[in-house]
């Protein structure tokens, strides 16, 4: 979110400003230009939809590496080290906290949550009800995937669950970035 990168056709800026400037196409172009990542599709879910989806699944299980004490919506939260069962609201807070850890840790937690939601949906046969889920969550989700596209991706989803080694997560490590103060703002990125 705080990476200061080149936005094709827009100059240097924080990566999280790309979509707001020119939509998902600029964000995809920015990822490709700076990181070599080609984005084929996108899915964005709002907070209300995220909470509802996790609750519909009966919550998710997360292995928390270390104790986290922070705030979420101005309320104190604590996540002890070890296996945690999270409802939708707790999962959203777990994904968002970063004051007592770092933005890099937050990204790893978000990857954990995506994995846990995906795995739970597949093991509960949620993918079989993809058409119903697609329509019932439409108000919470922004995507360029049509229902037909989602249905065509279902065999891949089943494959991934049975072959988790085929999924690779990448996080930019601290040693691969430099701290920079944005001129005229004092913002550190």
Describe each PLM feature range.
Residues 1-189:
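Non-catalytic, solvent-exposed segments at the cell envelope interface
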């Amino acid at each position: 979110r705080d990476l200061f990168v080149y936005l094709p056709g827009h100059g240097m800026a924080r990566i999280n400003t790309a979509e707001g400037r020119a939509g998902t196409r600029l964000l995809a172009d920015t990822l490709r230009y700076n990181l070599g990542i080609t984005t084929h599709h996108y899915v964005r879910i709002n907070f209300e939809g995220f909470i509802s989806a996790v609750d519909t699944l009966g919550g998710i299980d997360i292995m928390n590496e270390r104790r986290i004490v922070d705030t979420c919506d101005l309320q104190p939260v604590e996540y002890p080290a070890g296996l945690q069962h999270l409802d939708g609201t707790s999962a959203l807070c777990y994904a968002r906290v970063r004051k007592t850890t770092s933005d890099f840790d937050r990204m790893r937690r978000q990857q954990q949550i995506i994995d846990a939601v995906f795995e739970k949906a597949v093991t509960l046969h949620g993918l079989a009800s993809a058409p119903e889920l697609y329509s019932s969550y439409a108000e919470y989700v922004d995507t360029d995937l049509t229902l037909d596209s989602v249905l065509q991706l279902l065999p891949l989803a089943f494959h991934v669950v049975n072959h988790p080694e085929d999924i690779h997560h990448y996080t930019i490590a601290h040693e691969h970035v430099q701290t920079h103060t944005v001129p005229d703002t004092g913002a550190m990125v």
